[in-house]
Amino acid sequence: ICACLVGSEMCIRDRYQLTETQAMVAKLPVLTGDCDTVTMMSYGFDPYLSTWSPYHGAIYAVTESVAKIVAAGGDYSKIRFTFQEYFRRMTEDPHRWSQPFAALLGAYNAQLGFGLPSIGGKDSMSGTFEDIDVPPTLVSFAVDVAVEKDIITPELKAAGNKLVWLRIPTDEYDVPKYDQVMELYGKFREDVQAGRIVSTYALDRHGIAAAVSKMAFGNRMGVKIEHDVDARDLFAPAFGDIVAEVPADKVSELAITYTVIGEVTEDAAFTYRDMEITEADAEAAWKAPLEKVFPTNSGAEG
């Protein structure tokens, strides 16, 4: 999703325009005067999780879309959803009906948990070509209304700032504990409005390492991860969690429950224990998979 403040200088965010944004934010057009109201939109979906469990896939599609709105400075309690569903073709085989049923149960569970409704959607149950089926798909789109001054962009801002990790609690079935999640998201909004958070990123299946890397690319800042961070956590799926950049003197004032996981540095490198990866190498590896499909360099001179 394109994410900039349409109609504002905030469309030019990070210096190198490499930090992927996670929410679209648009000012409302007015003929006279000035309007600081903005609309927001985000999405959530992971095909690998949904293939493993359509139920969990739908739950975390909703949760991820909420987390992205929260991370961008929105108020979760004002969110409304619209869902887009795609499933393999339904036949006389009753087992094929289990996927949409499980996914819709998951989405319903999340709506009840957050107390937020879906106001529409579109579905397709013909996602089969010969013997190829689409993965069970329920994409959640979250929409919200906010104030321009509360919007947070994801690129790292300054060396010396700390990186903190907000983790959402889950139950024994890996389902979010919604009451506690909403409390955390509410406190996160308090921190945003108080100016204690300067950049954020909602985590996905790729975990902390991917998130802080994308945050760093935009202004070519560096990141030093704390030695005591478990290496397994760096790449573990963390749907609903948020990483935030906080000025060092503001960390103790945070309302959220957090773990300090690193620090922003001026060096264009990622450091963890005795390992260091230059940002140039990381950026090249990140761009490589799609370079042949969508070249970032035309090869033209001048």
Question: At which residue positions do the language-model features occur?
Answer:
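Single conserved hydrophobic/aromatic residue that forms the stacking wall/gate
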Residues: I1-G7, I12
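Short, well-ordered amphipathic alpha-helical segments that serve as non-catalytic structural scaffolds
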Residues: A58-A72, A103-G106, L184-Y185
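N-terminal small/glycine-rich loop or linker at the start of catalytic domains
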Residues: L28-P29, G33-L49
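A glycine- and small/hydrophobic-rich beta-loop-beta segment
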Residues: K157, K162-I168, Y173-T200
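Hydrophobic alpha-helical scaffolding
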Residues: D14-R15, Y43-I59, A72, M90-F101, ...
